[in-house]
Amino acid sequence: AEYDVSDADIEAFYQXXTMTW
């Protein structure tokens, strides 16, 4: 991922549809 978070966090971000950072 090109964000400063793990791929698992990115996956959760897309699934949950809300920003977590």
From Swiss-Prot:
Keywords, ordered alphabetically: Cell cycle, Cell division
GO process terms (BP): cell division
Superkingdom, taxonomy of origin: Eukaryota
Note: On the 2D-gel the determined pI of this protein is: 5.8, its MW is: 21.5 kDa.
Primary role: Possible mediator for cell division in the blooming process.
Protein name, UniProt field: Preblooming protein 2
Protein's organism: Prorocentrum triestinum
